[in-house]
From Swiss-Prot:
Record function comment: Seems to be required for the conversion of a precursor form of the large subunit of hydrogenlyase (HycE) into a mature form.
Protein name (record): Formate hydrogenlyase maturation protein HycH
Protein family (similarity comment): To E.coli HyfJ.
Origin organism lineage: Bacteria, Pseudomonadati, Pseudomonadota, Gammaproteobacteria, Enterobacterales
Gene Ontology process terms (BP): protein-containing complex assembly
Superkingdom, natural source: Bacteria
Pfam families in the record: HycH
């Protein structure tokens, strides 16, 4: 049995409906998309980064011990999944950027990919990441 950690990124949102939305109501639809899942909003997530379990643990161990960023990323082993949203971007971006100097080339590649995803969230606040531990 192999284990891995998958970072899935929000790729799009849509409302589950069969009828076309009248133009007059389109602003309500946009507002509903912005606030979340109250009107049948469906999030579509796509896998953007996959790490073997043991290598994920070694990667997050490069973050400063006791730091908020490390505690956040340790939520995956503790809870099985975490969500990374706009509120976590500055903290995680700074921590992973700082840790790159002590990382292996593979870890640096993952950090670069994660930093790119964090940049996407910074540019579009509705984007988020779901990070999950998966067992095959």
């Amino acid at each position: 049995m192999s284990e891995k950690v998958v970072f899935s990124q929000l790729s799009r949102k849509f409302i589950d409906e069969n009828d076309a939305t009248p133009a007059e109501a389109q602003q309500v639809v946009y507002y509903s998309l912005a606030i979340g899942h109250h009107l049948g909003v469906i999030d579509c997530l796509e896998a953007a980064l996959t790490c073997p379990w043991d290598e994920y643990l070694a990667w997050i161990a490069t973050l400063e011990a006791g730091s908020e960023a490390r505690r956040k990323m340790e939520g995956v082993p503790k809870y099985g999944e975490i969500v990374i949203d706009i509120n976590h971007v500055p903290m995680l971006a700074n921590a992973f950027d700082k840790a790159r100097a002590a990382q292996t080339s593979q870890q640096q590649e993952w950090s670069t990919m994660l930093l790119s995803m964090l940049h996407d969230i910074h540019q579009e606040n509705a984007i988020y990441l779901m990070v999950r531990r998966l067992r095959d």
